[in-house]
Regions:
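Nucleotide-sugar donor-binding and catalytic loop/hinge architecture
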Residues: 5-22, 70, 189-206, 213
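C-terminal alpha-helical cap of glycosyltransferases
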Residues: 362-388
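Glycosyltransferases and closely related glycan-assembly transferases
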Residues: 106-120, 126-142, 155-159
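Donor-nucleotide binding loops and adjacent catalytic segments primarily
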Residues: 64, 69-73, 195-278, 311-315, ...
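Active-site-proximal region of nucleotide-activated glycan assembly enzymes
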Residues: 55, 65, 135-195
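Acidic donor-binding loop of glycosyltransferase active sites
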Residues: 116-118, 273-288, 295-296
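A short, well-ordered alpha-helix in the C-terminal region of glycosyltransferases
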Residues: 349-363
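Conserved nucleotide-sugar phosphate-binding/catalytic loop shared by glycosyltransferases and other
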Residues: 13-15, 21-29, 52-102, 242-244, ...
C-alpha cells in the first residue's frame, strides 16, 4: 500500500531513506462543536512543518457536518460506519449497535493504511472506535472536551487516553490528573473583535445556530409586541435558519421593527463586532466565541443537549458574571423582554459582562493543543518502513 514514507520492492532492493512525514489522526465530528476544533488543530499542525514534513487525516461519518466542512477546508477526510447509542432505544438502538463491528473494522483499516504518530479525539461518534484502535496500536492519544460537563464518549476514552485537553478547569477536576486546561479552539477573527462603544440603537444579535432554533424563534416573535414600545431604540439581526425564516421576517415587518432577518450568517465574527448583546444557544464553540469576542450574552441552552452540557456551559458563564441565562422551559415573552430591557438600561452592566467574558478567553488554545500533541507524538524522523 503506497503512502508517505512507504516503499515496495523485492529482496535486495535499496532501503528507502526518505524521512517520513509526522502524521496526526483527528477523530470525531457530528456538530460544529466537534468539527471546528478539528479543523483549527489540523491547520496549526500542518503550519508547523514545511511541505511534506507533516500530514493529517480527519476521520468522521457521512452524517456529520464534517462530511461537508472538512473537504471545504481543503483537508483529507476518511469515513467510518458508526452511529450513536446513548439516549436512543427500540429498533434504532439495535440498528446502530449492529454498526459497531463495521466501525471497528473501518477504524482498523484506517490505522493500517496510515502511520500515525499521535491521535486527537474531538468527541462524536467516530471518536470512540478510532481512539480505541489508536490506543490498541500504541499510538499516543489526546482527547478534547470543550464542555463543562464531559460527554459520554470522552468520559469513557479519558481512562485510556495519554492526555485530556479541556476547555474548563472544573472539567479537568472531574476527568483527573491526565487533564490539561487548554481552552477551546476558536477562529482567529473572533479574537480580533474590538471593544464596542455603546450607543443607541441597541444592537441585538439573535441566533440559534446555523440551522436556527425553533424555540428561540417562537419566543422572540412572541416577545415583539412587548418589545415594540421601545423598538426605536433597538436594531435586531436575527439568524433564523431556513425553516422559520419567512414567518419571522414577516413578524418583524408587520410591527415595523428595525431588523435584518436572515436564514444564515456567513461572517459571524463581523456580526459579533456589531452587537451590544447576543441571544444564543450555549454550545461549547458558541460560548468560546462569545468569550473571545468579549460580548454580553443571554444564553438559552438547548434543553435536549446530551448530558445537559449546554446548561452547564451557560451556568459557568453566569457564575463568572459574564452572561445571563434563561432555561428553555422558562423562555416566555415576558422573561426574554425583561432580560433585554434590563441590559438596555444598564450599559455599565453590559460593559462588565464584556470584560468578564473576555477574561475567560484563551487565545492560545489551538497552539497549546498542538504543543501537547507534538510533545506526545512518536518520533517521525526515522526511515520509512512501509505500512503493513
Amino acid at each position: 500500500m503506497s503512502g508517505t514514507g512507504s516503499f515496495s520492492g523485492t529482496h535486495g532492493a535499496a532501503p528507502d531513506t526518505r524521512l517520513r512525514a509526522k502524521s496526526l489522526l483527528i477523530a470525531g465530528g457530528g456538530t460544529g462543536g466537534h468539527v471546528f476544533p478539528a479543523v483549527a488543530v489540523a491547520r496549526e499542525w500542518l503550519a508547523r512543518g514545511g511541505e511534506g514534513e507533516r500530514e493529517v487525516v480527519i476521520v468522521g461519518t457521512e452524517r456529520g457536518l464534517e462530511f461537508k466542512l472538512v473537504p471545504q477546508a481543503g483537508l483529507p477526510l476518511e469515513l467510518i460506519r458508526v452511529a450513536g447509542l446513548k439516549g436512543i432505544g427500540g429498533v434504532k438502538f439495535f440498528r446502530n449497535a449492529a454498526l459497531l463491528p463495521a466501525g471497528l473494522w473501518d477504524s482498523a483499516e484506517i490505522i493500517r493504511r496510515h502511520r500515525f504518530d499521535v491521535a486527537f479525539g474531538v468527541g462524536g461518534y467516530a471518536s470512540g472506535p478510532m481512539m480505541l484502535l489508536a490506543t490498541l496500536n500504541s499510538i499516543p492519544t489526546v482527547i478534547f472536551e470543550p464542555n463543562v460537563e464531559p460527554g459520554f464518549t470522552n468520559r469513557v476514552l479519558a481512562n485510556m487516553a495519554s492526555r485530556v485537553a479541556v476547555a474548563h478547569r472544573e472539567t479537568g477536576v472531574r476527568l483527573g490528573r491526565k487533564s490539561v486546561v487548554t481552552g477551546c479552539p476558536v477562529r482567529r477573527e473572533f479574537f480580533s473583535v474590538p471593544p464596542k462603544e455603546h450607543s443607541l440603537p441597541f444592537r441585538i444579535l439573535i441566533t440559534g445556530g446555523s440551522r436556527g432554533a425553533a424555540p428561540i424563534n417562537r419566543a422572540v416573535v412572541a416577545s415583539l409586541d412587548l418589545l415594540a414600545p421601545r423598538k426605536n431604540q433597538l436594531f435586531v439581526v436575527h439568524q433564523t435558519g431556513e425553516r422559520d425564516y419567512n414567518d419571522v421576517r414577516v413578524a418583524y415587518a408587520q410591527r415595523e421593527f428595525h431588523a435584518e432577518v436572515v436564514p444564515f450568517i456567513e461572517n459571524m465574527a463581523e456580526r459579533f463586532a456589531q452587537a451590544d448583546l447576543i441571544v444564543c444557544r450555549s454550545g461549547a464553540i458558541t460560548v468560546a466565541e462569545v468569550s473571545a469576542a468579549g460580548r454580553a450574552a443571554i444564553f438559552i441552552p438547548f434543553a435536549a443537549a446530551t448530558d445537559a452540557h449546554q446548561m452547564r456551559n451557560a451556568q459557568a458563564m453566569r457564575a463568572a458574571g459574564a452572561a445571563r441565562l434563561i432555561p428553555q422551559d422558562e423562555l416566555g415573552p415576558g422573561r426574554l423582554t425583561n432580560e433585554i430591557f434590563s441590559l438596555l438600561d444598564q450599559p455599565r452592566r453590559i460593559a462588565e459582562m464584556e470584560q468578564r467574558a473576555r477574561a475567560l478567553a484563551r487565545p492560545r488554545a489551538v497552539e497549546d493543543i498542538v504543543d501537547l500533541l507534538d510533545g506526545l507524538a512518536r518520533p517521525a524522523g526515522g526511515k520509512g518502513v512501509g505500512r503493513q
